[in-house]
């Protein structure tokens, strides 16, 4: 892991990470300190009982399920805020989905910025590099950026947009120079596809 000295100590914060692979949340829990404890935002509450991958996340005890509908926004916000208010870390895949590339990031959703501003906690950008394709001998790097302060910004439309842009820029910088791995052989492809579904491959992410 690169940039461990940038991780805030003994204080809650929101971790916004790139998301090339379903296994990424487990890497976060493995690489980051036990205190403060880390929780992962997602998956959707309705999916918690379907699919073995979602069940594994549920059994792990690290998930904060959410409801995507606007009518449930208040409940979703309360769940996320409760994690931060208890002094824990909330990790969010800012892209809102799996990415198909490691050296690029799709435009971020505004959820990470909104929650960080509501909780008044800093945002730590994190690039996960090396998990797009799974195969033996693969090197995985977690690259943390400087915390992004939320002071001076309001949790309104303008504040959320500005903070989202700052996070996007920081994550793009962390991915500068990252080259895409060539696809592995049949076994590596099979293992990768076993853990991941990408129905949007005809809509590639934009460069960070």
Language-model regions, residue ranges each:
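Short phosphate-coordinating micro-motif centered on Lys-Gly-acidic
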Residues: 3
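Catalytic core of membrane glycerolipid acyltransferases/transacylases, capturing the structured
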Residues: 8-70
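Non-catalytic C-terminal accessory region of glycerolipid acyltransferases
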Residues: 74-208
